[in-house]
């Protein structure tokens, strides 16, 4: 689980501005390597090259184009039921259309700083997964929505390596509902979900959230199979609406 990354973005803003200022002319400087994994660096290089070739300010659409050249991102989109080739066609069409460049002022800088903040918070270099998560709220995210790409399911595949597990249980069984940690679902969202869907008191909701964050997993509680299916479906729907890669499933009681 991740806290509000706004303050973390401020922490890395100065460093982010430095590498962005130099990225266009020296894309392989050490500062970039300190902030981003090699795969993310390649995606950023592709994005910058595409923007430079078109004589456009770097935007979220260029970043998305760069991400679409990454095999793991493409595989995750497919896993989530999307068509990456169709998305790339839509991106190229959008980049070829006239745009108001004033609307794109520092857009890519904000997104890459957010990705760097996500990586910093998790204690690792920012990856293509962080860049994908950082697209939230951008024109690229809206294009993905228009293409019927499930951004949350794609992020889930990038984080957890596949689709959310099916919940097929005999009705007579009791099960434990379990949460697993990720670096993108916010702590505030998890606490709200535990209160609203599972009716946990504030203190217990915070305790379960913190246990998930610190140990990697936590048990929400014991439920009948029927109740577990209903609550997990509700929880996943809420997470999907905000494109969070929340892992919630069951274990035998």
List PLM regions with ranges.
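Histone-fold recognition with a strong bias for associated Lys/Arg-rich disordered tails
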Residues: 1-167
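Terminal domain-initiation and capping elements
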Residues: 167-253
């Amino acid at each position: 689980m991740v806290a509000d990354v706004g303050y973390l973005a401020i922490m890395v803003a100065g460093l982010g501005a430095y590498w962005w200022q130099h990225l266009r002319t020296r894309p392989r400087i050490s500062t970039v390597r300190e902030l981003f994994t090699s795969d993310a660096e390649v995606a950023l290089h592709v994005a910058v090259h595409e923007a430079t070739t078109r004589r456009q300010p770097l935007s979220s659409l260029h970043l998305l184009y760069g991400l679409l050249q990454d095999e793991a991102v493409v595989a995750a989109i497919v896993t989530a039921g999307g068509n990456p080739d169709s998305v790339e066609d839509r991106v190229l069409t959008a980049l070829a259309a006239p745009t108001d460049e004033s609307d794109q002022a520092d857009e890519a800088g904000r997104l890459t700083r957010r990705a760097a903040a996500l990586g910093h918070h998790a204690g690792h270099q920012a990856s293509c997964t962080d860049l994908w998560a950082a697209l939230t709220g951008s024109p690229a995210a809206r294009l993905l929505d228009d293409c019927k790409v499930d951004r949350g399911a794609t992020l889930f595949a990038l984080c957890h390596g596949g689709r959310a597990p099916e919940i097929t249980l005999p009705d007579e069984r009791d099960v434990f509902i379990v949460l697993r940690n990720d670096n993108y679902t916010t702590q505030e969202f998890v606490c709200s979900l535990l209160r609203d869907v599972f009716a946990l008191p504030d203190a217990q909701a915070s305790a379960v959230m913190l246990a998930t964050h610190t140990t990697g997993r936590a048990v929400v509680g014991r439920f009948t199979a029927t109740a577990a299916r209903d609550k997990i479906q509700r929880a996943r729907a809420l997470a999907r609406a905000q494109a969070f890669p929340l892992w919630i499933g069951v274990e035998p009681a």
